[in-house]
From Swiss-Prot:
The gene is pgk. It comes from the Bacteria. It is found in: Cytoplasm. Belongs to the phosphoglycerate kinase family. Pathway: Carbohydrate degradation; glycolysis; pyruvate from D-glyceraldehyde 3-phosphate: step 2/5. The keyword Cell cycle does not apply. This is Phosphoglycerate kinase. ATP binds at residues 197, 314, 340-343.
Length: 387
């Protein structure tokens, strides 16, 4: 994959527009999970250190496009950056007609989704973004799968378009995991729905030596084996697809599960054989024997790709399966790469971030890359590198 890298450029005195992924959860005006901002800090600091005129922006939440809404302002991100950086940080609301930035100064340009045409990759808006800078740095892997004005369009018109360190590292790590993986390669796909991850399961079934399913996805596979899943979240219309995948590759289906009669944080958990799930019960986690079976598989892996928990780990009574799997990945000597919001939350909860080889900041982009889809922002950077 040939792209221009920000680290290869001299940014001194240049106007540098960094599209980061600062889409973080905010409550009462404060950032509640800073993982994405932390990941972007080295890129921002590198540009500042070189004496660039630094502009950074992102989307945050889902405001009505083209309308300012204080609830989705990047102000909490600016306040966070002020605490973390020794530099002053300014938030600029109106910037499309130009913004003054001094060398070594950082300004945050307000939420790109307040600009009409952002999501449609509007050419006029893209050109306005491009006119603000000498160098465009795409560093938001989490939105690289979307062709939008601040992730894709701007790169077509900026004088120079390059990949930031975070994006470059994501592409390198995913390339290593998917193109030439050390074997055996184990892929874990969890979460609630088969339908949203069916193409991922299909793609991974062709490259992974072992596929593991968890969460609501596993319930569909349990049903495909003829077991009653009671009131569990599963997709009846995809049982045949699950049967097809079971016939073409080795997928361990849970033999024991933790169930409850209601979906609640306080619901007591009952551990039982997968054969004994009652009509009024729902499966909320895999059982101990199933979790240990997965831990054994992971122990022998050389590459692990992890996307999604194996149970409702947010509820303490249904956390054990995901905890056993997470610790098995942490203890493994394999090259491990993890991605997706729920996966990152589990990594934080179990305190294993330093034991995962690479943590991807992307959710949808991570999955689309795994599927082998072309990411528009990356394709644009490759195209610009040829000129």
């Amino acid at each position: 994959m040939s792209v221009i890298k920000m680290t290869d450029l001299d940014l001194a005195g240049k106007r540098v527009f960094i599209r980061a992924d600062l889409n973080v959860p905010v409550k009462d005006g404060k950032v509640t999970s800073d993982a994405r901002i932390r990941a972007s800090l080295p890129t921002i600091e590198l540009a500042l250190k070189q004496g660039a005129k630094v502009m950074v922006t992102s989307h945050l939440g889902r405001p009505t496009e083209g309308e300012y809404n204080e609830e989705f302002s990047l102000l909490p991100v600016v306040n966070y950056l002020k605490d973390k950086l020794s530099n002053p940080v300014r938030l600029v609301k109106d910037y499309l007609d130009g913004v003054d930035v001094a060398e070594g100064e950082l300004v945050v340009l307000e939420n790109v989704r307040f600009n009409k045409g952002e999501k449609k990759d509007d050419e006029t808006l893209s050109k306005k973004y491009a006119a603000l800078c000498d160098v465009f740095v795409m560093d938001a892997f989490g939105t690289a799968h979307r062709a939008q004005a601040s992730t894709h369009g701007i790169g077509k018109f900026a004088d120079v378009a390059c990949a930031g360190p975070l994006l470059a590292a994501e592409l390198d790590a995913l390339g290593k995991a998917l193109k030439e993986p050390a074997r055996p390669m184990v892929a874990i796909v969890g979460g609630s729905k088969v339908s949203t991850k069916l193409t991922v399961l299909d793609s991974l079934s062709k490259i992974a030596d072992q596929l593991i399913v968890g969460g609501g996805i596993a319930n569909t596979f349990i049903a495909a084996q003829g077991h009653d899943v009671g009131k569990s979240l599963y997709e009846a219309d995809l049982v045949d697809e699950a049967k097809r995948l079971l016939s073409t590759c080795n997928i361990p289906v849970p033999s024991d599960v933790r169930v409850a009669t209601e979906f609640s944080e306080t619901a007591p958990a009952t551990l039982k054989s997968v054969n004994d799930v009652k009509a009024d019960e729902q499966i909320l986690d895999i059982g101990d024997a199933s979790a240990q079976e997965l831990a054994e598989i992971l122990k022998n892996a050389k590459t692990i790709l992890w996307n999604g928990p194996v149970g409702v780990f947010e509820f303490p009574n249904f956390r054990k399966g995901t905890e056993i799997v997470a610790n098995a990945i942490a203890d493994s000597e394999a090259f491990s790469i993890a991605g997706g919001g729920d996966t990152l939350a589990a990594i934080d909860l179990f305190g294993i971030a330093d034991k995962i080889s690479y943590i991807s900041t992307g959710g949808g982009a991570f999955l689309e890359f795994v599927e082998g889809k072309v990411l528009p922002a990356v394709a644009m950077l490759e195209e610009r590198a040829k000129k």
